[in-house]
Curated annotation (Swiss-Prot):
Residues 1-35 are annotated as: Disordered. This is DDB1- and CUL4-associated factor 12-like protein 1. The gene is DCAF12L1. WD repeats lie at residues 87-137, 138-184, 185-252, 253-297, 298-341, 342-376. InterPro entries: Beta-prop_DCAF12, DCAF12, WD40/YVTN_repeat-like_dom_sf, WD40_repeat_dom_sf, WD40_rpt. Belongs to the WD repeat DCAF12 family. The keyword Repeat applies. It holds the Pfam family Beta-prop_DCAF12. GO terms for cellular component: Cul4-RING E3 ubiquitin ligase complex. The lineage of its organism: Eukaryota, Metazoa, Chordata, Craniata, Vertebrata. It comes from the Eukaryota.
Amino acid sequence: MAQQQTGSRKRKAPAVEADAESSPSQGLAAADGEGPLLLKRQRRPATYRSMAHYLKVREVGGWGPARLQGFDGELRGYAVQRLPELLTERQLELGTVNKVFASQWLNSRQVVCGTKCNTLFVVDVESGHIARIPLLRDSEARLAQDQQGCGIHAIELNPSKTLLATGGENPNSLAIYQLPSLDPLCLGDRHGHKDWIFAVAWLSDTVAVSGSRDGTVALWRMDPDKFDDTVAWHSEVGLPVYAHIRPRDVEAIPRAIINPSNRKVRALACGGKNQELGAVSLDGYFHLWKAGSALSRLLSIRLPYFRDNVCLTYCDDMSVYAVGSHSHVSFLDLRQDQQNIRPLCSREGGTGVRSLSFYRHIITVGTGQGSLLFYDVRAQKFLEERASATLESSSGPARRKLRLACGRGWLNHNDFWVNYFGGMEVFPNALYTHCYNWPEMKLFVAGGPLPAGLHGNYAGLWS
């Protein structure tokens, strides 16, 4: 692996705040230690700290620990199904950045985001404070090229949450930062991609794969211990220095007969513990790779819905890939010849599925129309609203699909907006990214207006 040190002319990024909040259980324990109620309170298990937990215990019956051991997984599944209908939105102000394409939780308060205007920043969801992160610059000057409108499309944390992968100042390069400090570690700008990076996935703590608009996937290996010997802070001016690396392997996806000019790699997802990698290309194909010291393609299959395949996720519990397209989500179970899970239709006016995530058997769908939908893959139906008590009848409550509508966000009232959209005051935001903080039951959602010429952003915390 070739390495070289380079000094960045940008300031050191502010360190991410440590998550030092005390847990609710510690507060309860302290309260229980006062007065003569100690013995009585000890009889109640300390695990019942929420109404959802209490209701589920009452439903299955009994308080004995022997009966609790068998339904811990059932309780989690119950919480996953009930959480969406309990969420309420609080919008976050992001200033004038254009369209948030990617996001990830760093800790219980901070989310890192990447935008179409090539801005990388951390937002504190409690205080609203925003800190920009300097982008890493290539070691050699590149030929002048128009990079307007490219942006940061991917942000991924490795399994141990010690490294963060995203795009560099040149969107063709892969930037790696250390966590929690967000100090730069290395930049993959040598013999890698020749066009923008659209997707990143971690196969392990030190191995990442990137997918590009040039139709290639690249395998990168990071060795922080090795970099410690070569990466240091400049002793005189305190500028960050980072290594420059090249990929271990670069492979091109096969060129399709139907649409050979549109084989851009749009999304990646790591497929469980088998070192397998799923990839979706804009020509309407799904590709499966085996990753070791190099990449080996296992198969390529035509997707049933092949317009705007822009997002991909994997469900560990069910060993299923989900692909978002123009108006559907398709499910791929590669263990079976026949697909037993039928595709779901988002029915959001053909604005497309823009973001997907799995948690257990529930998939969250972010649409181009500013809506969040929730689908139970096992039951093969959308989660439904619970009707109010006044609407219930003897035949049971009326149900309809649970749909969370996101707020207006911010929109730049420029000439494009006036000339092409007649000065529409309300314009739905495409939800390009969302990420859960499950321990605290929080959901971060972000995006911006769908038309390419419109400039704006949306971010919201649902809790």
